């Protein structure tokens, strides 16, 4: 029994000894823009209870948006969001400490906007393409991008509006109306956005 007990005590001591070191090493790599090394140390830091929330935030905020791995962005931001309400973090080395919840909200907005504006960009591409197969492929890409934005921040009406629009272009009126209805059901949707959604619904019905 004493051998097993000493083994677990040893594991705890080793874990305590290295707690913080992986996170600090990751921050140095982030500052130097050594993204692969930073990812490696951040993933290690996830194993330290005191560091896991900050490590998860940096993975979701700085590492996986670069590779456009939006599933991992959401996965690690969900982990970061389990931090206690009074947890504070410096989003970057030059920032003052703010609540983790504020840092998460700002980061998600940044990633959402990137996806949303990419989704809207497909409209100009569609206007320049006449080939049916190419248009269909672009519409599918636009829908996928809009869905990624919606999954990342389900409370933003813009991604639902884009889904309604692109499904309407695709000729799928059921899905077009579904996403417009979902957007209108979101809390605190501004009146001008509601009006735009209703206009879009009218166009989809034609």
Task: Enumerate the predicted regions with their spans.
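TPR/TPR-like (Sel1-like) alpha-helical repeat modules
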Residues: 61-89, 181-186
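Sec-dependent N-terminal signal peptides
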Residues: 4-15
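Conserved structural position within tetratricopeptide repeats
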Residues: 43-47, 81-82, 89, 144-151, ...
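N-terminal, post-signal-peptide region of Sec/Tat-exported proteins
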Residues: 36-76
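Alpha-helical solenoid repeat scaffolds, predominantly canonical TPR units
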Residues: 29, 41, 75-79, 83, ...
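Residue-level detector of the short coil/turn that links helix A to helix B
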Residues: 33, 67-68, 137, 171
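Amphipathic alpha-helical repeat scaffolds of TPR domains
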Residues: 20-21, 27, 51-65, 90-129, ...
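Single-residue signature of alpha-solenoid repeat helices
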Residues: 38, 72-73, 135, 142, ...
């Amino acid at each position: 029994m004493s051998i097993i007990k000493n083994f677990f005590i040893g594991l705890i001591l080793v874990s305590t000894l290295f707690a913080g070191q992986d996170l600090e090493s990751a921050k140095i790599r982030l500052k130097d823009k050594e993204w692969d090394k930073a990812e490696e140390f951040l993933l290690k830091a996830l194993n330290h209870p005191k560091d896991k929330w900050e490590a998860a935030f940096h993975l979701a905020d700085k590492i996986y948006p670069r590779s456009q791995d939006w599933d991992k962005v959401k996965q690690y931001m969900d982990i970061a969001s389990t931090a206690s309400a009074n947890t504070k973090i410096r989003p970057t080395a030059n920032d003052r400490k703010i609540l983790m919840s504020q840092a998460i909200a700002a980061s998600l907005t940044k990633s959402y906007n990137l996806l949303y504006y990419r989704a809207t960009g497909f409209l100009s591409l569609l206007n320049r393409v006449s080939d049916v197969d190419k248009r269909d492929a672009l519409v599918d890409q636009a829908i996928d991008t809009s869905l990624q934005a919606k999954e990342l921040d389900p409370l933003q009406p813009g991604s639902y509006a884009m889904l309604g629009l692109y499904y309407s272009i695709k000729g799928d009126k059921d899905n077009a109306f579904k996403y417009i209805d979902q957007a209108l059901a979101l809390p605190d949707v501004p009146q001008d956005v509601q009006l735009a959604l209703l206009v879009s619904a009218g166009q989809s019905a034609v």
